[in-house]
Regions:
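N-terminal helical cap/lid subdomain that shapes the substrate entry/recognition surface
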Residues: 2-17, 22-101, 120
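Asp-based, Mg2+/Mn2+-dependent phosphohydrolase catalytic module
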Residues: 1-12, 105, 112, 118-119, ...
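Residue-level marker of alpha-helix boundaries and capping positions
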Residues: 29, 58-59, 94, 113, ...
């Protein structure tokens, strides 16, 4: 699935990946566990019903990038306890993915994680996938000074901290809105989408933007996509 005249990967030397629902498939519903814990946390923190907490959670997620950011801005919440509680989930649905590890290894250059989650959660996911040795570093929500994607400041902090040249980088994401700023900075952008009927697990707004001008490439097969990139780069010498 390609748009007309997408940016290529010929110049890419840094490969930047989102974590959840990008490195592992959405149908594992790992984020569903986090989602439920966020809802429960909001209900307890604000002393409201689970239904009201759910509506507030989704509203804040869409408006602020994360529910946490909304709680901080609207209610003055301190994030430390929240971050610890909502990421206490069962990572066992994730199985080792040697094909993903091999595909990442073939890509020439650095590989970095840019996530709105915590480093602890990212480490757990990467170890379950058996790809933790493929990544140089994780830039998490704490490194972002608690300001989530798609905030432009978060990308600026990430690029500065890791010395990434955006015009020589590619960004892989499962949310199109999180690719708009990277594209504007000069990065080649890839939207990773669920395959087949599993797309129904997504919220409608999350599925928007597949045809947006800031999305260079769309794939529902990350491993195959990376293998094709690596093969093309190898053939080009």
């Amino acid at each position: 699935m390609e748009k007309r005249n997408p940016r290529s990967f010929d110049q890419v030397e840094t490969w930047v990946f989102d974590l959840d629902n990008t490195l592992y498939p959405h149908h594992l519903n790992l984020w569903g566990q986090v989602d439920a814990r966020i809802r429960s946390y909001i209900a307890g923190f604000l002393k409201i019903s689970e239904d009201d907490a759910f509506r507030l959670q989704k509203d804040y997620y869409r408006r602020y990038g994360t529910s946490m950011r909304g709680l901080m801005i609207e209610h003055g919440m301190q994030p430390d306890d929240y971050l610890e509680v909502v990421h206490q989930i069962d990572h066992s649905p994730i199985e080792p993915n040697p094909a993903l590890g091999a595909a990442l290894e073939k890509l020439p250059g650095r590989k970095l994680i840019l996530t709105n989650g915590t480093r602890k959660h990212a480490d757990a996911v990467m170890r379950r996938l058996a790809v933790h040795e493929r990544f140089e570093a994780v830039f998490d929500i704490v490194a972002a000074e608690l300001e989530p994607k798609p905030s432009p400041q978060t990308y600026d902090r990430f690029l500065a901290m890791h010395g990434v040249k955006p015009e020589r980088a590619a960004m892989f994401e499962d949310l199109a809105r999180n690719l708009e700023v990277p594209y504007g900075l000069g990065m080649t952008t890839v939207l990773v989408v669920p395959s087949g009927a599993r797309v129904v697990l997504r919220e409608e707004w999350e599925l928007e933007g597949h045809d947006a001008p800031h999305v260079d490439h769309v794939t529902d097969d990350l491993v195959g996509f990376l293998e094709r990139i690596a093969s093309a780069r190898n053939d080009a010498g």
